[in-house]
Design a protein with these regions (language model features):
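N-terminal "first-domain core" detector
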Residues: 1-59
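Beta-strand-rich solenoidal segments
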Residues: 5-6, 50-182
């Protein structure tokens, strides 16, 4: 099937949905957080088990997220015996038509691992930070927060999808043309 867009509507014969625009933008803008300011969507310790997610923007699958002010996030109480890792994510939820910051918690363990990111047709997550929640702690310090925004496998920064053009086919055609006319 052929598709084309975007044309002006004459007598409402051209209507476009959000997913049409998202598909268009996703073809040249990759997923990630916007790098300016450098503190965009940074997770910082606040008071007790509270964190702040700084003002910032993210882009997932052609959709835009904007946190316009410090967003307070509270972690669950620590276990008395075992540790866990909480992961702060920006979640794109197509079913509910929303993007938001969420906290995911690992299982309690002597050696916990961060919860996996969900990345499927309906939900896509970018990890902003991992927080080590030690047994019995009542406050999170900045040293327990691992910033994941620059980790390209977990988050990364917004960049052009086309990083480099493969010119091999064009080069082969050009070489064949030169060979024919020499």
């Amino acid at each position: 099937m052929e598709k084309s867009s975007f044309f002006n509507s004459v007598s409402h014969d051209r209507t476009y949905k959000a997913e049409d625009w998202a598909e268009y933008f996703a073809s040249f803008i990759g997923n990630g957080v916007f790098p300016v300011p450098s503190t965009g969507l940074q997770v910082v310790a606040n008071d007790g088990m509270k964190l702040n997610v700084k003002t910032g923007k993210a882009w997932i699958n052609g959709y835009f997220y904007f946190n316009t002010g410090d967003l307070a996030v509270e972690l669950d109480t620590a276990d008395g015996q075992l540790n866990r890792i909480d992961r702060v994510v920006v979640r794109w939820d197509l079913t509910n038509r929303v993007m938001s910051v969420k906290v995911k918690s690992s299982s309690f363990s002597a050696s916990p691992t961060a919860p996996a990111l969900q990345r499927d047709a309906d939900v896509y997550e970018l990890a902003l930070a991992d927080i080590y929640v030690g047994a019995g702690v009542t406050a999170i310090t900045q040293s327990k927060i691992t910033d994941q925004r620059l980790n390209t496998s977990l988050c990364g920064v917004v960049a052009a999808v086309v990083q480099q053009i493969d010119t091999a086919a064009f080069n082969a055609q050009l070489q064949a043309w030169f060979a024919e006319y020499q």
